[in-house]
Amino acid sequence: MDFNTVSSFQDILMRMSKMQLRSSSEGLNGMVTQFESLKIYRDSLGEAVMRMGDLHYLQNRNGKWREQLGQKFEEIRWLIEEVRHKLKITENSFEQITFMQALQLLLEVEQEMRTFSFQLI
């Protein structure tokens, strides 16, 4: 394929991908926002693991950090189930690819949160 054909094909795929995301359920934006929040929380756990004495720091800063951690795990499990459900009911291949990638990211974030939290406990 020549460069123009490849470029045009990529452009079409991008436009179709954007159209499919807009046509997905309204809850998708909320799911993305929640996912971003969970990624930030995961990053803060990772930073806490790297600093010395952070278990005490976390306990002093937030006496209910274990409860907060439990809530974050509930959130990510809910998001995983939502994405799995949408994946099952979606017939459009572009949406299926998008939801498969989202599911993979969610599972990675959940695993990293578990790893960091076990190191803190």
UniProtKB/Swiss-Prot annotation:
Keyword terms, alphabetized: Host nucleus, Host-virus interaction, Transport, Virion
Superkingdom field: Viruses
Residue ranges annotated as motif Nuclear export signal: 12-21, 85-94
InterPro entries linked to this entry: Flu_NS2
GO terms of biological process kind: exit of virus from host cell nucleus through nuclear pore
Recorded GO CC terms: host cell nucleus; virion component
SUPFAM superfamilies xrefs: Nonstructural protein ns2, Nep, M1-binding domain
Gene3D superfamilies for the chain: 1.10.287.230
Localisation: Virion; Host nucleus
Family to which this protein belongs: Belongs to the influenza viruses NEP family.
Note: Average number present in a viral particle is estimated to be 130-200 molecules.
Subunit structure: Interacts with protein M1. May interact with host nucleoporin RAB/HRB and exportin XPO1/CRM1.
HAMAP family (alphabetical): INFV_NEP
Protein function: Mediates the nuclear export of encapsidated genomic RNAs (ribonucleoproteins, RNPs). Acts as an adapter between viral RNPs complexes and the nuclear export machinery of the cell. Possesses no intrinsic RNA-binding activity, but includes a C-terminal M1-binding domain. This domain is believed to allow recognition of RNPs bound to the protein M1.
Name of the protein: Nuclear export protein
Native source organism of the sequence: Influenza A virus (strain A/Swine/Wisconsin/1/1961 H1N1)
Name of the gene encoding the protein in the UniProt record: NS
